[in-house]
């Protein structure tokens, strides 16, 4: 896959489809079964769990910004809308993933997440950067730019 194409799995037949980023808004269809591909999910954060983390984050063809949060955490709630905005802005270039650490303790333990919010940027299955605290949108975008560079 090149930087100007995405690989999208068809939710109907499971076939993998190469879709140019420039054509995402044209309602692309699966090359095998001709059903519409699930592009709407590219514009919102993906909820990940202990059992989906490796597939959604570590094996992603796109870089991923993972937001580790908990429902009782005020600063986590404050950055939620920022994550939604970033998912829209970087659609097709960066995946935003949200991990509730209270419900998914294995990943929190694996990556030594001891305070929240904690975010980390993953590219090609490797953690590139770990960010702790409710960072302003501008600072997050600066870190994202380094990864997308």
Task: List PLM regions with ranges.
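Short cysteine-rich clusters marking metal-coordination/redox-active sites
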Residues: 10-13, 30-33
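Cys/His-rich microdomains that often coordinate metals
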Residues: 14-17, 37, 80
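Short linker/helix segments within small regulatory modules
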Residues: 19-29
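A short beta-strand-turn-helix
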Residues: 46-64
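Short pre-active-site segment immediately N-terminal to redox-active cysteine/selenocysteine motifs
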Residues: 61-62, 68-72, 115
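Thiol-based oxidoreductase modules, predominantly thioredoxin-like and allied folds used
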Residues: 68, 83-106, 113
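Conserved redox-active cysteine motifs that mediate thiol-disulfide chemistry
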Residues: 68-82
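Non-catalytic, surface beta->alpha helical segment in thiol-disulfide oxidoreductase systems
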Residues: 115, 121-149
